[in-house]
């Protein structure tokens, strides 16, 4: 097992500890966006979260929830399965189109909100 060392404290590390409901991706997403503004790191993270693919946000919440009971090798296996599934579905090429090809930064996601994502669709990534 690898045991990492913690980073020295810095201005961006001084973020209060928040606890999130990882059982519900939509609720977790809303809790993250409700974190008060003011810290540049938190503000940038919230901007990225709100402008990114809702399915990816939901996947990340589910992935974190599952990873707490897994080892490193199992986490990498889960990551590979998720990535393999994501490239089969329309949101990945849509994100590439909007960011890299047309550069319009106006993706049309499969689901416009995390709360719209059916649980079965989310779980199909795992």
Task: Give the positions of each predicted feature.
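C-terminal alpha-helix plus adjacent terminal tail
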Residues: 1-126
